[in-house]
Amino acid sequence: MLRGEEVELPRFNFNLGKKEYKGDKLRIDEHTILILEGIHALNPELTPQIPAASKYKIYVSALTTISLDDHNWIPTTDNRLLRRIIRDFNYRGYSAQETISRWPSVRAGEDKWIFPYQENADVMFNSALLFEFAVLRCHAEPILTSVPRNCPEYPEAYRLLKFIKYFTPVQDKEIPPTSLLREFLGGSSFKY
């Protein structure tokens, strides 16, 4: 692609666990703006052939800035995990139990492949929304309550259920289709 050749772009099918090619093709030239999106896009090992002066790096993460009270702050990992549970359920066919089970591996991958490079970004964008937990509650509760009590993931599901009950539920009909929250809830006007 960087040599100007046309390439076929794959999409990852999470239900099948593999990438698929469906005829989406792309050719770029020296005037094309190339946007690399994804959690690994800041890793310089992925783009050594692109000069540093030609890159503008943006780090996007849900950096929660609210607290339950004066003493109990909300970890950004809870926001990200709730988003992931809902997204995985809606788009990947994973149960909350499966997502919670994978979470330690996801966190280890972040520590190794994402967080070391976040400081290299030219700008950081906080994607957390002040009203987000109130909306996530409506989606997360039924998914989290399906985790069986006798499985190892139940304590985490129970903790998250207790946590989101602090927020008055807000129905997502109030959320416009252009909101980034729609990436997780569904109903977006954008194609992912």
Role assignments for model-derived ranges:
Residues 39-42:
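Short beta->alpha connector loops
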Residues 44-192:
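Conserved NTP phosphate-binding and transfer environment spanning the P-loop NTPase/kinase superfamily
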